[in-house]
Amino acid sequence: MNPSTTQARVVVDELIRGGVRDVVLCPGSRNAPLAFALQDADHAGRIRLHVRIDERTAGYLAIGLAVAAGAPVCVAMTSGTAVANLGPAVVEANYARVPLIVLSANRPYELLGTGANQTMEQLGYFGTQVRAAISLGLAEDAPERLDSLNATWRSATCRVLVAATGSRTANAGPVQFDIPLREPLIPDPEPHGAITPQGRPGGKPWTYIPQVTFDQPLEIDLSADTVVIAGHGAGVHPNLTELPIVAEPTAPFGPYRPYPLHPLALPLLHPKQVIMLGRPTLHRPVSALLADPQVPVYALTTGPCWPDVSGNSQAAGTRAVTTGTPHPAWLQRCAEMNQHAISTVRSQLAAHPLITGLHVAAAVADALRPGDQLVLGASNPVRDMALVGLSTDGIQVRSNRGVAGIDGTVSTAIGAALAYERSPGYAGSTDRPARTVALIGDLAFVHDSSGLLIGPTEPTPQQLKIVVSNDNGGGIFELLEQGDPRLSAVSSRIFGTPHDVDVGALCRAYHVEGRQIEVDKLREALDEPGVGMRVLEVKADRSSLRQLHAAITATL
């Protein structure tokens, strides 16, 4: 067995021992030893391998897999620009704290600077965006030292896993594992009895690291009029569920929220203090409240850092030790304002003469059922879902909120669906299987349309429906400063970016079923039986979005 093959097999074995169950592989020559080792592990049923030709979409596929499975996922690629194409996914994984492992095959380091083909300084390429950048070093052709080399390779792999999962830091995130490989890059004809150097007995990792306990209790008196703002990455806090909670769709508060609070109700209330969970990013009324110097803010997070955009946080910890109880009059007032806000949004939707992205979001929200997984685009869709009063009871909601880019949304949804469909708690049944429903805008869909490319031999979601709210451009800019009517002569082109893409034709090019439907037929289409991946396009208007949102605000 040649050194590169031996090293690759050891690394793959140790990754599996450390909890890796899904790996995304992009084809190349230099990463061939890893590719052969991964294929062997897939054939043996130890991992599930996903082959993709585009490293950018592969990275987001891995993010979807990792988020939905709650486990580290690897992406393996060859050297050069293949590594650079992981940049967007690495940045998202950094800020969303996703355990993404970049297995970057490299040329031998002595070739750097020589002009060798497909060679660049890729170790450390991701800079501060990764938790660690670890090099394994070239495998030596030294059979007499194989036991020592085996220990070195396995120990390094464990360090990669610990950094990615945050076992010692409570701060999961991406890691680059750079592995220079020398020819030969394919397995030798092996003599009978050739074996890979073994790991610890019983399938245990080479170096066991228990999960760190990160606990910083914070005493908070709930007798003051309090609201909870739960953003992306919020932990579950059972002792706070009796408070009014403004929960972003990805916050895990569906079944634990007897007092939901609509974000548009906040300006109608005057809370005396705020408990902030996770990292809220969606709503301007929330940002305004968190920035109010007269309102104390207590930040509770699941890791060592806490968000504080306005610099207004009074204290930070990981859990609340509560004293006092909320006043019934305050809870009643919040409940009334919540219902008023939801009713206002829905009544204005009914009165509006055109179909907008908000209408599409409302139709999707009303069609969901317990056991579903919902993946939301990072621009208007995730905000629209919060505004139409989505109930997340029994629903898993995902969205790329790390840096909130629209790139990779299709691939993220596919990865999330693949992970969800084989999760232990998957609620599917033969008569009514649980689904993954993705709601994304047309720009996000077109931007990541290559994510639809799944080879005929690759794992494919069996219950994924992608709803494309197509308003032919960037609808979110209609609601920002750039959407000011006085700028309309130029803003449509440079911000709205109309594209006129035929979504159905794009789907057909990738052999994906897709069709255009009316918004009032969306529930029926989502409930249609069948397996596989489908795209449902709903035409929407963005020219009246500013008017619709203004009408909602005025009615409130």
Swiss-Prot record:
Membrane-crossing residue ranges in chain numbering: none
Pathway recorded for this protein: Quinol/quinone metabolism; 1,4-dihydroxy-2-naphthoate biosynthesis; 1,4-dihydroxy-2-naphthoate from chorismate: step 2/7; Quinol/quinone metabolism; menaquinone biosynthesis
EC annotation from Swiss-Prot or TrEMBL: 2.2.1.9
Keyword field: Magnesium, Manganese, Menaquinone biosynthesis, Metal-binding, Thiamine pyrophosphate, Transferase
InterPro entries xrefs: MenaQ_synth_MenD, THDP-binding, Thiamin_PyroP_enz_TPP-bd_dom
Cofactor dependency: Mg(2+); Mn(2+); thiamine diphosphate
Cytoplasm among keywords: no
GO biological process: menaquinone biosynthetic process
Top EC class of this enzyme: transferase
Keyword Lyase part of the UniProt annotation: no
CDD domains: TPP_PYR_MenD, TPP_SHCHC_synthase
Reactions this protein catalyses: isochorismate + 2-oxoglutarate + H(+) = 5-enolpyruvoyl-6-hydroxy-2-succinyl-cyclohex-3-ene-1-carboxylate + CO2
Cross-referenced Pfam families: TPP_enzyme_N
GO molecular function, one term: thiamine pyrophosphate binding
Cofactor remark: Binds 1 thiamine pyrophosphate per subunit.
UniProt record similarity statement: Belongs to the TPP enzyme family. MenD subfamily.
Function per UniProt: Catalyzes the thiamine diphosphate-dependent decarboxylation of 2-oxoglutarate and the subsequent addition of the resulting succinic semialdehyde-thiamine pyrophosphate anion to isochorismate to yield 2-succinyl-5-enolpyruvyl-6-hydroxy-3-cyclohexene-1-carboxylate (SEPHCHC).
Description of how the protein assembles with itself and partners: Homodimer.
Descriptive protein name: 2-succinyl-5-enolpyruvyl-6-hydroxy-3-cyclohexene-1-carboxylate synthase
Species annotation: Mycobacterium leprae (strain TN)
Gene transcribed to yield this protein: menD
